[in-house]
Amino acid sequence: MSQLNDSDIILFEYNFHYQNIRSKNTLDIAFGIDRNFLFGCGVAIASILLNNREISCEFHVFTDYISDKDKLYFSDLAKQYNSRINIYVINCDKLKSLPSTKNWTYATYFRFIIADYFYNKHEKILYLDADIACKGSIKELLDYQFSTNEIAAVVAERDVEWWQNRASVLTTPQLASGYFNAGFLLINIDEWNLNNISSKAIEMLRDPDWISKITHLDQDVLNVLLNGKVKFISGKYNTRYSINYELKDKVDNPVNDDTVFIHYVGPTKPWHEWADYPVSRSFLIAKASSPWCKEDLLKPVNSNQYRYCAKHKFKQKHYMAGIFNYLKYYKEKCF
């Protein structure tokens, strides 16, 4: 039995449908975000639509906040691409008691709400983190067929050494054969609910023994619960890259012509004005082809962002801007 009942969780729903009749061959794509990712999510959707005009997609955005301006932009986006976008405003009270960190808030648990919400509504959902940009076709995901007992198609994170670390820390030896990043989940909704994954995950996240082991919150938990019931697919669907890698002298950029989704991991996102690098181009192209086209990229608003902004400005040889942001950083830290 799910701990996340629709009537308790969904407060409001806004539907922006400019494709009058939903195609039978439609890929449902879902995002779970807080207010800090609304801008990024909108452009992520635009990037998918821009690169997949021949595919019917319906988008589902689960958030705990949305303004009238945001609703207008999402409506305009659906109209611009003759698409369907649904916004669900959710009650997060049941999630706020779960573990969180500086980098991962309770919003990371929205994927549990998503997987439960679509039970008996859709057979398959593509869950994506909002800090992605699409630069290729997702038709293979639309056509994807799950095998027997398969709960999700996933993409491996990092390398064998990392998998072995997770297997040891999480006392789950089978993870040595593969550990996935939860920012991309092609979910078999029936199997997910048959195995009661969301409820089991929440129970684990309330268990002191498990809390002492996990470092990657729901990602660790999902790897344990879905162990042996996932299929690892091509890394082109979740090509992870931190824009902060650009601060290094030598950068190994995994993004190439085959990449479908760039996943901008780490604290610096392509919607930050200090993220001025070629790897941000896919995001910026989509932004220019969306209702957010005239919106400024975001400036730093806290000490951590001022620090990274300063570092990137020096890397980009914008020295005065670098000095200014370091001064702002020290002011935030000291006062």
What are these regions (language model features)?
Residues 1-27, 33, 189-335:
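A glycosyltransferase accessory/donor-loop signature
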Residues 72-75, 120, 135-146, 198:
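Short alpha-helix within the catalytic core of nucleotide-sugar-dependent glycosyltransferases
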Residues 57-65, 153-155:
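Short internal beta-strands
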Residues 70-72, 76-117:
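Active-site-proximal specificity loops/subdomain of glycosyltransferases
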Residues 132-166:
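Conserved donor-nucleotide/metal-binding helix-loop-beta segment in metal-dependent transferases, i.e.
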Residues 125:
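Short aromatic/hydrophobic "clamp" motif used to bind/position activated sugar donors
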Residues 28-31, 48, 58-61:
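Hydrophobic targeting segments
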Residues 35-52:
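Histidine-anchored nucleotide/phosphate-binding helix
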